[in-house]
């Protein structure tokens, strides 16, 4: 599902809200989530999951075009861990 598809689905369910209001709300939520992660904080949405940062250590990579070795710096990457309720719901839907 894309962001546009999410907006369309929410608009069809929440007919009292305009598409612009739904789009603005989603953009605001995502912006706050990105800002929270950028500050190094964790986000927990009970029943859904949590977002945190994982550190990837520096390593030696390879340029796929030339095959040359490249030093890659360490970095933080966003990580999502699904909650138990979400895992159970997905597994039940797929198993059915």
Swiss-Prot record:
Underlying gene: ihfB
PANTHER family: DNA-BINDING PROTEIN HU, INTEGRATION HOST FACTOR SUBUNIT BETA
Organism domain of life: Bacteria
Any GO BP annotation: regulation of DNA-templated transcription
Family per similarity comment: Belongs to the bacterial histone-like protein family.
SUPFAM superfamilies, A to Z: IHF-like DNA-binding proteins (SSF47729)
Entry's Gene Ontology molecular function annotations: DNA binding; structural constituent of chromatin
Protein source organism: Photobacterium profundum (strain SS9)
Assigned GO CC terms: chromosome; cytosol
One Pfam family from the record: Bac_DNA_binding
Assigned keywords, A-Z: DNA recombination, DNA-binding, Transcription, Transcription regulation, Translation regulation
Gene3D superfamilies linked to this entry: IHF-like DNA-binding proteins (4.10.520.10)
CDD domains tied to this protein: IHF_B (cd13836)
Role, per record: This protein is one of the two subunits of integration host factor, a specific DNA-binding protein that functions in genetic recombination as well as in transcriptional and translational control.
Subunit comment: Heterodimer of an alpha and a beta chain.
Protein name as it appears in the record: Integration host factor subunit beta
SMART domains listed in its UniProt record: BHL
InterPro entries: Hist_DNA-bd, Histone-like_DNA-bd_CS, IHF-like_DNA-bd_dom_sf, IHF_beta
Residue ranges of coiled coil: none
